[in-house]
């Protein structure tokens, strides 16, 4: 970097975007208003399962301000389709999975509480809401299907599925795994449940749709993590219009966590209706709608069997999973419990034989799809709970049990038994650092001191690995993916040397305006204040796949790096011409093009100006201008890893679990901005702690969501956390230019098993060996009470 500039790779630069957000200058979808806009309100089902006999909207149509009311019949008459699944794994018998249609408005049947029945469009939201109360609907109520354990073969939900099973998938060698388990010296079995949670992004979903009669095109402002995918699917597969006729803008977005990747009925209905009414239409979810309509996460039941040899080395692992996918499929709902879950079952461990069978189950509940981590947290939770449980069964320290089963650092690249090949890793280094940070050796003294105060103290570990930067596209396609998983970037240098980067990723809390600018600063030697990052507008950015799966830096950042390399190479040719030197003699460093071994030089700004004022320019070799495009399709996943350790105290009188200490050491490869990385780790831990201790989406036997507001759905607050100790080790990714791996989901992946393992450890003197999430005060108190009662018998 030039002297005085310290804003490149590795610098903890303050986020450029924060001033806008902290001063109220953010522009979210609900801030957008169009002249003459109407407001949409969706009437939703209040029963979980029923056929629709009749919908009468006649009285509602007479209400003040009502412009139109549409039902599923209107949508069907126009031939508008519903959302589609983006990745379809093959069943173990070779057949295709079941993909029942997802109507935008229920056409003949409702399948969960919150299912869309009709949309009322009026001059104001209050008028639309009031008119909806005048709609009458005649339903034939059917038995709901809520319990995952009894859903298969229960009351039929879709005509296309007589058994309520979307797919029956497998991965691994069943015969080899059976043989390994049969010959094992010890068998450990555990049923592990991953509870259902609700994403709860700070900003609810919203949409503003507008039709332009002049050029017969649509504009949709929406809360999307992936505007190009929204445009592609909505235009080509749902509305059957040319993709170029739909302009999608995702402005500032207040969090996503996966739930804003997908296309929901509301955005599509508003877009369809705006042409019919020739007026803009606005819809913003309230928080109750978010609970009832946004895709939920997790909800797996796993039966785990692990085999050990005489030295307590793992010889085989079998996992049978039931995955609740809810009433309809969405973008990643089928891949989350299959390829994003089953392929991670080796974890950090050398496991010669692995087999998993996953059944995706339909229930009369809200759709379940990818939520921060997307399959990786589910795999890590079942594996790390089982590792802790097995260590206790064989009488080993949990840390040492993990250590003896780690893949050695000299074994890379390492081919797992479940398809993935890890390029690089060192799992002992973060384990050792985390143990040091938490003072693991001094824990028993702290446990004894807590006991003197009448508290139970426990410590729990989680050593995880995740797969990020999903790719390559050819492999994804062969496995049922319906999109490419590359990323794109355009780097445009202005005549004065400032730079605009147009990226196919999307930033909704990750800090791309800063980290991407740091890559530019590092490569070109310019201040980050001279770099503008553009994203979220399909008319401005190149086609890209958005942000999810910790892919933005590993894939999108590498695309930017490659485009910058092209800019530099063109700049060298221009500089060589101006300096009358050979191309091979040109060097570029710290924002200057120099001729090797001489004092001849041109600044980056001078070369930029020459590209646009090409008086002294190599016209025979180059076109004027300085703008380059790159698409990057990775050769492999990236594999972040690490160890998180939680320490808790439990009050036996109340069952309250207090998180008293946390230490983690992660390997994310090279860090672009350590401060932003730490913030991402903190956020992930908070969400994982929420799931482990507090959060749970609970349905009653009638399919009513009992936790449909913050009165009943508990989330963590700042005072629930100690000061989090965060550190890193580095093994750089071997196959991208930046050596980065991704960091956004690690905390949410590692934290739930660490915390539950700590709770179980705290209660282990009572004989407690397992605890399901969330470890609520009531559940913990009952475990203590039951153990004490049993001991007294």
Segments from the language model and where they lie:
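Thiamine diphosphate
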Residues: 252, 256-278, 282-284, 512-520
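C-terminal catalytic domains of large/alpha subunits in multi-subunit enzymes
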Residues: 72-73, 240-245, 275-281, 310, ...
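Flexible, low-hydrophobicity surface segments
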Residues: 1-164, 187-190, 266, 276, ...
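Glycine-rich loop/linker segments at domain edges
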Residues: 11, 17-20, 87, 93-100, ...
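Helix-loop-helix junctions that connect adjacent transmembrane helices in secondary transporters/permeases
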Residues: 88, 155-238, 406-498, 706-720, ...
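Extended active-site and interfacial segments that coordinate phosphate-rich ligands
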Residues: 19-20, 133-144, 225-227, 232, ...
């Amino acid at each position: 970097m030039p002297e005085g500039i310290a804003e490149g790779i590795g610098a903890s630069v303050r986020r450029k975007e924060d001033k806008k957000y902290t001063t109220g200058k953010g522009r979210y979808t609900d801030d957008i208003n169009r002249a003459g806009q109407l407001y949409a309100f969706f009437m939703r089902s209040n029963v979980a399962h029923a056929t629709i006999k009749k919908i009468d909207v006649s009285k509602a149509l007479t209400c003040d301000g009502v412009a139109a009311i549409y039902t599923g019949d209107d949508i069907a008459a126009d031939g508008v389709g519903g959302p589609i699944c983006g990745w379809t794994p093959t069943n173990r018998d070779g057949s295709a999975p079941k993909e029942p249609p997802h109507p935008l408005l229920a056409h003949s049947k409702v399948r969960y509480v919150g299912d869309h029945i009709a949309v009322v469009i009026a001059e104001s939201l209050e008028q639309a809401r009031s008119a909806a109360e005048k709609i009458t609907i005649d339903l034939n109520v059917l038995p709901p299907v809520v319990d995952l354990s009894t859903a298969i073969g229960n009351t039929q939900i879709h005509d296309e599925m007589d058994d309520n099973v979307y797919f029956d998938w497998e991965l691994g060698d069943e015969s080899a795994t059976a043989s390994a388990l049969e010959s094992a010296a010890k068998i450990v079995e555990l049923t592990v449940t991953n509870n259902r949670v609700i994403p709860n992004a700070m900003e609810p979903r919203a949409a503003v749709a507008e039709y332009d009669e002049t050029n017969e095109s649509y504009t949709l402002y929406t809360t999307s993590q992936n505007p190009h995918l929204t445009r592609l699917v909505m235009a080509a597969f749902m509305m059957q219009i040319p993709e170029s006729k739909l302009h999608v803008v995702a402005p500032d977005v207040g969090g996503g966590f996966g739930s804003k990747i997908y296309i929901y009925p509301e955005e599509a209905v508003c877009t369809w209706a705006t042409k019919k009414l020739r007026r803009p239409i606005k819809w913003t979810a309230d928080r109750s709608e978010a609970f009832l309509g946004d895709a939920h996460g997790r909800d797996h039941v796993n039966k785990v069997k692990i085999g050990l040899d005489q030295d307590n080395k793992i010889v085989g692992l079998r996992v049978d999973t039931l995955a609740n996918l809810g009433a309809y499929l969405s973008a990643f709902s089928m891949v989350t419990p299959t390829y994003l879950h089953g392929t991670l079952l080796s974890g950090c461990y050398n496991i010669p034989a692995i087999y998993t069978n996953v059944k995706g189950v339909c229930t009369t509940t809200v759709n379940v799809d990818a939520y921060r981590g997307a399959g990786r947290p589910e795999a890590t939770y079942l594996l790390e709970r089982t590792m802790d449980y097995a260590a206790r069964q064989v009488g080993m320290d949990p840390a040492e049990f993990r250590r003896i089963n780690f893949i050695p650092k000299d074994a890379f690249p390492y081919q797992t038994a479940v398809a993935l090949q890890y390029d690089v890793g060192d799992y002992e280094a973060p384990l050792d650092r985390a143990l040091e940070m938490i003072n693991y050796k001094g824990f028993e003294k702290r446990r004894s001191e807590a006991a003197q105060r009448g508290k139970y103290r426990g410590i729990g570990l989680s050593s995880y690995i995740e797969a990020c930067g999903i790719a390559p596209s050819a492999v994804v396609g062969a496995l049922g993916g319906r999109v490419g998983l590359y990323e794109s970037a355009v780097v445009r240098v202005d005549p004065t040397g400032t730079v605009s980067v147009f990226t196919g990723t999307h930033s909704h809390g990750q800090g791309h305006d800063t980290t991407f600018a740091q890559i530019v600063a590092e490569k070109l030697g310019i201040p980050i204040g001279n770099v503008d990052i553009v994203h979220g507008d399909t008319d401005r950015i190149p086609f890209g796949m958005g942000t999810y799966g910790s892919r933005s830096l590993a894939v999108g950042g590498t695309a930017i790096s490659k485009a910058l390399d092209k800019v530099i190479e063109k700049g060298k040719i221009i500089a060589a011409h101006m300096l009358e030197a050979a191309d091979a003699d040109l060097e570029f460093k710290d924002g200057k093009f120099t001729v090797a071994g001489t004092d001849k030089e041109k600044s980056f700004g001078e070369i930029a100006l020459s590209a646009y004022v090409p008086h002294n320019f190599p016209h025979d070799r180059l076109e004027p201008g300085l703008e380059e495009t790159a698409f990057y399709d990775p050769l492999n996943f990236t594999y972040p890893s690490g160890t998180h350790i939680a320490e808790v105290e439990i009050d036996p009188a109340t069952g309250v679990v207090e998180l008293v200490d946390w230490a983690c050491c992660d390997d994310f490869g090279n860090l672009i901005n350590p401060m932003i990385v730490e913030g991402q780790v903190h956020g992930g831990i908070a969400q994982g702690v929420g799931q482990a201790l507090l959060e749970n989406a609970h349905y009653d036997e009638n399919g009513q969501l009992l936790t449909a507001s913050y009165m009943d759905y508990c989330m963590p607050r700042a005072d629930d956390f100690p000061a989090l100790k965060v550190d890193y080790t580095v093994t750089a990714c071997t196959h991208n230019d930046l050596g980065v791996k991704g960091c956004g989901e690690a905390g949410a992946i590692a934290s739930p098993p660490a915390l539950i393992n700590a709770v179980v450890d705290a209660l282990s003197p009572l004989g407690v060996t397992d605890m399901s999430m969330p470890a609520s005060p009531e559940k913990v108190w009952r475990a203590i009470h039951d153990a004490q009662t049993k001991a007294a018998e």
